Regions:
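C-terminal cap of metal-dependent C-N hydrolases
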Residues: 292, 308-342
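Active-site glycine- and acidic-residue-rich loops that bind
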Residues: 96-107, 192-196, 200, 208-210, ...
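Hydrophobic faces of well-ordered beta-strands that scaffold small-molecule active sites
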Residues: 11-15, 53-55, 90-96, 119-125, ...
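A general structural motif
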Residues: 167-169, 189-191, 209-218, 237-244
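His/Asp/Glu-enriched, well-ordered alpha-helical/loop segment
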Residues: 182, 224-234, 238-317
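Metal-coordinating catalytic core of metallo-dependent amide/deamination hydrolases
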Residues: 60-192, 262
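Glycine-enriched alpha-helix->loop->beta-strand junction motifs that scaffold or abut catalytic
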Residues: 115-119, 201-208, 223-229, 253-257
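Metal-associated gating/positioning segment near the N- to mid-region
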Residues: 3-75
């Protein structure tokens, strides 16, 4: 295979992307049909060089008009149909994100019970004043800006969220930890802020610390053997949108294991090349964060590397020279299990 000077990389492995949810609800309160949403998401994933994707679907939300407050049955049916009819370019798995303080989290998880694509569960708590939103000032900016809340509504929601957390978070946490243990599902903690958060996750059997918000939490995760996951957009933008620790800072400290595209599929390759361009990581180290490291974390030793006997999941990447002197990674070809899908 002559790639005319382009890079040949292993197919990217994505453990956490919210992109499917964006296709299912492209605007607030606008619900898109499940099959075209799935196929549009799948095409975008493949175009980003991702050959194995864990679609992150959230369960638990007071607002029943939101995706995370509504049943997922029809979405799972679409995934089953598309898989059975060979309509998908990438290999899709399920990553269920469980909002622990929400009253309906366990009920909304029911359709996922025993689903063959279920491979990862993460435990979330987005209560203002906790974890990602430990800084209430940052939380206020986010909710009044993106959500359009008034300051009065924000104050009411903070109080209401604290009440729900006190009632539901711990019993829901115990339920999902037990589910993962008894069903052999990988467990991830989310937005760890302190060493105590990491210690709890480790005791519960978590393998991943998703988006640790502080250097101390990331260091504690490594000390206890948890792999850290940070967002590609964090690298590309030069920092966290919610004011937390920068992914590049963790990489410099040797504390970055895995990159996730989070909410922008194309950010995986862009982040890899950004880390290399900024001399934060060598090329092979940066590529490992989106290939062999997530593959091993997911228990998939058959992919993530270019080696005899492994799956022929491949990505051809061209580095285009731009007028401003920068270089842009461009996906020119994608193969999954030896078959060209893009």
């Amino acid at each position: 295979m002559d790639l005319d000077g382009d890079y040949l990389l292993p197919g990217l492995v994505e453990l956490h992307t919210d992109n499917f949810e964006r296709h299912l609800m492209p605007r607030p309160k606008v619900h898109w049909a499940e099959m075209p949403a799935l196929l549009g998401h799948d095409a975008e994933i493949a175009a980003a060089g991702i050959t194995t994707v864990f679609d992150a679907l959230g369960v638990g939300e007071a607002d029943t008009d939101s995706l995370r407050g509504a049943p997922w049955d029809r979405v799972l049916e679409a995934m089953d149909t598309a898989g059975a009819r060979d309509l998908l370019r990438a290999e899709h798995h399920l990553h269920v994100r469980c909002e622990l303080p929400a009253p309906n989290t366990i009920d909304l998880f029911t359709p996922f019970h025993g689903h063959p694509r279920l491979s990862l569960i993460s435990l979330m708590d987005h209560t203002p004043g906790q974890r990602q939103w430990e800084n209430l000032a940052q939380a206020r900016i986010y909710y009044t800006g993106k959500k359009g809340w008034s300051h009065e509504k924000f104050e009411r929601q903070v109080a209401h969220s604290a009440t729900l957390q006190a009632q539901y978070a711990q019993p829901h946490r115990a339920y999902f930890v037990d589910y993962c243990r008894t069903h052999g599902i990988a467990l991830a903690s989310h937005d760890d802020t302190t060493a105590a958060h990491v210690a709890q996750a480790h005791a519960e059997g978590a393998a991943l610390s998703e988006f640790p918000t502080t250097l101390a939490a990331a260091r504690a995760a490594h000390e206890r053997g948890l792999l850290t996951v940070m967002g590609g957009p964090n690298v590309v933008r030069g920092g966290s949108h919610s004011g937390n620790v920068a992914a590049a800072e963790l990489a410099r400290a040797g504390l970055l294991d895995i990159l996730s595209s989070d909410y922008v599929p194309g950010s995986l390759l862009s982040a890899v090349m950004q880390l290399v361009q900024d001399q934060v990581l060598a090329l092979h180290q940066a590529v490992a964060t989106v290939t062999c490291n997530p593959a091993r974390a997911a228990g998939m030793p058959d992919r993530g590397e270019l080696a005899p006997g492994l799956r022929a999941d491949l990505v051809q990447v061209h580095m285009a020279e731009l007028p401003d002197g920068n270089r842009q990674a461009v996906v020119r070809g994608v193969w999954r299990e030896g078959r060209r899908v893009l």
